[in-house]
Amino acid sequence: MSFICWGVFQENRLKPRCRQPRAKQNCFVRQLVKFLGLLLAFCWLSQSVKAETLLLKSSKGVPFRLNKVADGLGVPWGMAFIGPEQILLTERNGKIGILDTVSGVITRITGGPKVMHSGQGGLLDVAVPPGYSQRGWIYFSYSKAQQGKGVTTLARAKLKGKRLVTLQDMLITRSASTTGRHFGSRITFDGTGHLFFSVGDRGVRPNGQDLSTHAGSILRLTLDGSVPENNPFVQQKNALPEIWSYGHRNPQGMFYDKKHQRLWSIEHGPRGGDEINLILRGRNYGWPVISYGKEYWGPVQVGEGTEKEGMEKPIKFYVPSIAPGSLIVYSGKAFPAWKGNLFAGALKLTHLNRVEIDNSGKAVAEDRLLEGLGERIRALVESPQGWLYFSTDSGKIFRLRPLVNNP
């Protein structure tokens, strides 16, 4: 930056224009003040632009612009658009706000749930279903204290002015644990009156294969919290009826692709073995029996191997782990070349992960965007314009949009 400003100074050196000594002195002072003002403005503008905007290019040749929209937040865990330029966001410390994406101003919202903010727990996801503008319900996931243990909980409320009202817990899951780990959890909607809700194994590995606990499962409910009659384990003894799939470790990303009617999830493996899974009704996704990860304490494979009859293999796995914190299927018009791609935020390897999927649902290519940003990318959401917004654990919100807007 100093090099740029010095270059401007050299190109715009003052030239004496006054002949009389006093007039010359006054003239020089006026010109100096004017020049320094211009120089200061130029340098400030240069610093501002460089701090707020980065120009990058993906490996597929899609140019885009990255802007920082907001800063100074707690860990922004969930984001949902409730208007063309308004993002409702949750912070893990329990705070809720509405971000104006044009001005960057955040309006604080009161009336949220009382959260157990400990370890990986706190106020987690926020999501709004199709038809939000008519019904007004907003859905949250959070960790709730229950007899000294943390429990992943699904709740909903309505927004009235700057306050949440009619707050109600829809499902306090059977997932109590004293560990502060693996709460999940993401919320997504299929557009036909159902929601899906992920719950981590709570750091207790056997939970993944235990149908008598919600931990280590993806759940399916109606929008009022009741259990659909066609859930796979409704009639099975000792199985919880909310369970849609099981054998999961810690799914922190989940998205329902309405165009292809596919439910996708991404979950943390142990040391290696993060997975992208296509979630099907009643299927077992293997944790902790099968995994591509290794034990934390040594170079020993977790479980019995990477495949077993009756258990689903991931469509993609990551070794080493990227630590995925979110997942969406891109459907906008702003980036036509990315339509149908999966995007995930990487926490450990600090990038935006893009995966191309073919018509059969197989992963055919991967791209790692924004590796140079050095930020743990947490939540990810697509705007009505087709731009991507993401949050970071350092408390920032970024916007990624085309370098040249498409019609």
Regions found by a protein language model. Give the residues of each.
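Beta-propeller fold detector
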Residues: 67, 107-113, 165-172, 229-232, ...
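Bacterial N-terminal signal peptides
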Residues: 36-44
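Beta-propeller blade signature
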Residues: 153-161, 213-223
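Bacterial N-terminal signal peptides that target proteins for export
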Residues: 23-36
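Blade/loop signatures of beta-propeller domains
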Residues: 51-64, 228-236, 295-308
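Acidic, Gly/Ser/Thr-rich repeat motifs that build Ca2+-stabilized beta-propeller blades
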Residues: 51-205, 253-256, 261-269, 320-359, ...
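Conserved blade-ending motifs and adjacent loop-strand segments that build the rim/top face
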Residues: 364-382
